[in-house]
Amino acid sequence: MLRAFEDAGVDLFHASTRRFGDPEWPESDLGLAGWARKLSGKPVIAVGGVGLTVDMVETFSGKDTNASPDINFPALAKRFNAHEFDLIAIGRSNIADPDWVAKVRDGRPDFIRQFKLADLGDVAEEAKQASTKAS
């Protein structure tokens, strides 16, 4: 499938998963971003749970998010230094606190505002209802 995208002119892949650092298959330590990079040789953006302990599905179930860049930065640094991805995207953490990157850069993680389901507004209620129906 990656080959078809490459043939169509894709020059960057965005590998979005619940948790960027989780291996995609049990036989390998590579996450989805790592596999995309390995198979295509193209630059890859990884995303999924950066600085968070709870994934989006758990958030919709009412589980509180503990936010800190220290939570999974060792895994992020390890995978980045292993050239599994070229860029990292920040989703929920940046929705909750638009200054997240600056606070991490400046060594002020204690000032990061944690993501709450209410940060998504009306979308949160619709997703919560859909999640309840699916259960």
Model features per residue range: what roles?
Residues 1-135:
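Flavin-dependent oxidoreductase catalytic cores
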